Structure formats: structure tokens, C-alpha cells
Amino acid sequence: MKFTVIVVLLAAIAVNGRLIRRYRRSTHNEYKMCIPEDLMNSCNEMASQETKSTAKIVCIPARDRMECIDKIKQRQADFAPVDPEDMYVAAKSPNQDFAVFEEIRTLEEPEAEFRYEGVAVIHKDLKLDGIPSIKGLKSCHTGVGRNVGYKIPLTKLKNMGIIGNLAEPDLSPRENELKAFSTLFSKACIVGKWSPDPVINDKLKQRYSNLCELCEDPAKCDYPDKYSGYEGVLRCLAHNGGEIGWTKVIYVRKFFGLPVGTTPAQPSNENPDDYAYLCPDGSRVPITGTPCRWAARPWQGYMTNAVVVKTVDELRTKIANLYTIGNRNHAPWLEKVLELNNKTLPRENKIIGPGDYLDKANYTDVVERDYGPPFKTTRFCVLNQDELEKCRTLSRAAFSRNIRPRFDCVLEKTVDDCMKAIRDNGADIITLDGGLVDKAQKHYNLKPIISEVYGELGGSYYAVAVVRKNSLYKSFADLRGAKSCHTGYGRTAGYNAPLYTLLNQNLIKADQCPYVAALSEYFSGGSCLPGSKDPANKIPEKTAEKLCSLCGGNVDANDGTSLDSKCNADSTESYSGYTGAFRCLVQGQGDVAFVKHVTVPGNTDGKNPESWAANLKSEDYELLCPDGGRAPVDQYEKCHLAHVPPHMVVTSNSKTDGEVDEIRNALVSIGKQFTDRSDLFKLFGSFNGKKDLLFKDSATGLVSLNEESPVQKKYAELLSVINACQPKA
């Protein structure tokens, strides 16, 4: 942060135990606001607004909010809007000096200390002898996984010892929670998707059906339901036999017609004198009195670091000015960038570290809500440092957002090493290309449980051959003697589909074994087929040399190590994977690249900012059709080598149904959470400039696999052809 200074000492405050001096400067300043890259245009529009404050906002793009937290810590950015869950991630970061300096409050309750307070409401005449005697009551809840109606009572009752073991090893974290509620309460209403997987959801609702008995539609036990949500809890309590309800204070006051913040009392048919707040110590408080909360959810706010705290008053003024302008002009950037709207306002708070901010609301243990021992994890097997970093970032983001089990990360050198680790219970999952899934099933006793989804195509994609538009190739026969670029050995688009095409056209003979050697001879100009030198693939040395001849290793390395990773089957080889194979073609190493249908559109026309791709145009490339001729890159449905199944997540076949279910649940949950809110964590897309880490960049979601699809069956036929000549182990 650049500035010239004439300062007056104002105060000294503590952030995370550090004494930080605050100053008010007489000169204007520049503040770097971190924003997800998708919102840069909106942010720049906001930054261009003229305000009374002469401070300047500069927009700093980041992949997502997780990267914004890192940028603020590293002084690459000055501030960003954050949720309490992001504050939790920040508070757990080593050697951090973050500070929450402003809250986003509602106009309805501008003086409220917290966004909302979780309370328990009971009938006034209910006979209870302390909190332990709530066992057997009929309980009303907002919905599964929600804060005041689910996470807060579960966490606090566990801490009190009212709820027992939540770590039965044979049950998933979610089932442990549901079983605890089912055992504690005789009946309840807890609507919602108990699992994002429909099969698991139905199974759990049959097993713990008493948790749906107080709902409007017990058989459905899902939204919409008149006895769900904040107000629904109170209807359940007042009119459907409920004896205790878990909701938030503002809705209690509205339900009984009491004043709320700036809103005066309203008429109500409900009598507050018939009910009471049940306090965590077992005492009671009248509904008309000061409520006793079990925990509170803090406000959203803005977070900075210790350096910016010194001049934060100037930044606060700037935000206030922008809020006024944005509201007056109904500017879209107000909500998109500052996360404010016509029902909220920015409010200065006493500067405080994010951990202390959460503790003030008794909210830290609500976020953590991880029961054990044993502490369960889903161990993702990764192949390089980039993938390891993404996995660890995913783990932090998912845990803060209530996704269990926690993800852990296991680093191995090769895909085969990962498959061995999963087989031997050293890891739990890895995402594999369809061709490698077949290998995993046959040689490592693994099974696919989750499928990537690709937009309108769903769980499938097209394998294509790409050539430069100015090349002379018109058919696969023309490719004899050419130079070829492949995604990797054994992979669908880069190896299996082109090999099948050459066999199908009799360009490689059915008895020309081994086929991998025949492929190297067909593309006698040389190839880059990453993974060819991996001993696990058992490719003869001379053949492997030919198939690796065009690979470049890490072509971007400047330290003399570029060839150390030559022909590796991961991102340490620049020409590995879909993007890598296309780069091999672009940079003149090859004449043809075997990739998937979205590879060219995803790396041209400004879609990939890397230097080698920044100026590429999709119109300069065409698809080579297996039946002859060429087609534009967007006509893949009529010009492709194969219509193939998606990449899939595999796990060990030896796992129990319960263990598989909890892995499915965690994966489908991250797919939904971070597809709906990619600004929080970008699950699909490049990470630190690297492509296809953990999942393919082109994926748009994750779904459970319960049976073989028609595309998988068709692909199995393709595999049976290309595997007919495999060298014997």
C-alpha cells in the first residue's frame, strides 16, 4: 500500500494479541480490494465513482475468496468482504494478523450485536428439571444442516454431554448427527436434503423417520413445509405438538407481535405469556424479556491486515461514501462487490481479530463441529505440489462450510502409486480418466462412485483430433509419419480413442502387437505421450523413447530443471493433459493433438491468459474427422473419435457401504456448494495457473454413480478392442 504520510496518533488497539497503532492521515490513500476475478468489471465500475473521500480503491483479482484471504495476509491486497466461515479460515492461518474492521448489518436491526441469536423456545408450563430432561421431548427445527435449528443445538448439547457419541466409526458424520437427534427426541421435524445423494437421503429418512413425524408432510420431509424455517419452528411449537423449538430471536419477536429493532409492535394471535426461552443453564426467561442465547451468528463484514488498520478510518469513510452512491443509483456493483443492498448498511465495529470475533458469539465451535476421536477424513490422492496445494485449500474451504468428513491430502508420485495407496488403505479417492478407471477396476480392485458432469452434455464428453487449420491433413491415413500430442498413456481422449480409430480403420493391424509400439511407429515423426516411461506401464524402453521424444518437461522452468519432469503424466510435464496436449500442438511440437471437445474453446479467444495461449484464435484450428474431412471446433457432435464417459472418482472396493456413502456425501456436497458459490472456492477451473487439478477444469458438477450408463457400456466395447493386444503382465 503506497502513501505519503503526515500522521496524528489516535489510539493503540490489540489484534490477535498484537499492539497495533492507529493513525489518521491527512493525505489520501490507495486501498487494494480483493475480488473474485469474475467480478472485476463490476469492481472497476465501483472504483471509478467520485466520492467525498479522496481515497482510491484499486481492484485486485483473485481466483476466489480463499485466495483473497492469502493475498490480504501477504500484503498483495488490503481488504475484502468475508463471511464468518471465511473469518474462521483466516483465524486458523499461521502467523496471521487479520482484523475485522467493519460489519454488514441490517437496516431492520442496525444496533444488534449479532446477525442473529440462536434460542430455544418452550411452553411456559413445560415441566423440566434442567437441560438433561429435554430427552424425549418433541422438537421443532429449521432444517437439516442449518445454523440455529441444527448446528447450534447439536454443538451445544454435545458440549454439555446431553448428546453422547457422535463418532461411531460405521456411520457417516451426518448419520451420527441424525442418530443423536433421533435418540434424544421422541419426535421432531428436521426437513431438507439429509444427503445431496438421493439414494442416501431416502435411506436415512427411512432409518430415522421419527425426525420427520412433526413435519407437515412426514413422508416427504423436505422444503417447502409449513413447520420448517425460522417461523415454521414456532408454528410447529404452537400448533403441531412441538414442545421445544430452535430458532432465532427476531422471528420469535415477529411471531408474538413484539417490537423488532426499528419496527414497532404488530398485532398477533399468539400469546407470548404462554412461552419462555430455555437457557443453556436450564433457567427460563420470559419471551418479552431479554433472550438467553445458545450461540449467535456474527455479521458478515470486511477484513484487513495489521498494516491497513493504521489508516482504516479513511477506508471506512470510502466504503460509506460508496454505499450512499450505490444505494442512490441502484448500482449492481453495490451487492456484487461490497455485498451491501437496500436492506443492509456498513457499520464500524471495534477492530478485532477474526478468531476473537467468532468467539464473542460462541460461534467457533459451531463452525468446527467435528466430533471424535476418531476424526474421520476423506483422503484425496494427489500427484504433485500444485494439486497438493489445491487439495489443502479445498480442505479448509469445505470444513469451514460444514462439509464432513474433512478432506485430507496424500501425495504420491504416479497414478499407479495412488491406485495402490487406495487399494492398500493409504488413501481413499482419486479422480481418473475413463480409461484409467478400467485399469483401476481390473488391476487394483477399485470402483467408480462419483462422476464429473459437463454442462449440457451431462456425464460424458467427446474425444477429438485437432489440427492447425493451415495444415494439409484431411484424414487419419494422412497422419502416418506425423508428430502427435497426447494427454497421457491409457487416457481416453489422448490414447484410447485415437488408437481405437486407427485400429478401426485398419491403419494399425489387429495383430500388430503391442499396440503401443504400433502407435509409436505410426507417428514416426515423434510423439509426446506422457506416462510412457512410467515402469508401471511396462512400455519397452525404445518405444517409450519415441513416445516421449516431443515432450518438454517443465518448459516454463528457468532454473535448468526443465527436463527433470520430461514425459511425466502430470502437470510437471507442460504437454501433459488436455491443455498440455493442445499446447504441444500450438508450440509446433506436434501436427495433431488428441484432446476433448472443450479443449480448444477453453484455451483460445482470450479464455486462457497464459502467455502461450493469450493470443490464440479458435478459428485457426479444426477437428480432423475419423471418416475423412475436417470441421470447425464447435462441430464435435458430428466430428469426433468417440463419445465417452466422464472422469470419475474411484475408491476401494473393500470399503463398506457406509464408508462409501460418507465419501459420496462429501464429494457431492463440495460439487454443489462450490458450483453454486464458486466465488467462495473455485473447485473447477485453473488453480495458480495450473489446469485440471483434482478435477477437470471443464467439469460443472459432481454426481453419484449408482449404475453403468449407456455411454460407459459403449466405451467398454472400445476398451475391449484396444486391450485385446496388451502385453501380458
Regions of interest found by a model, annotated:
Residues R65-P81, E85, V89-P94, P132, ...:
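Short helices/loops that flank or line small-molecule/ion binding pockets
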Residues E37-D38, D64, G145-N147, G229-Y230, ...:
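Gly/Ser-rich catalytic serine loop of serine hydrolases
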Residues D86-V89, D125-L128, V144-V148, I250-K254, ...:
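Solvent-exposed loop/turn segments at secondary-structure junctions
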Residues V89-E109, F255-P291, K439-Y454, N470, ...:
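Ligand-binding "clamshell"
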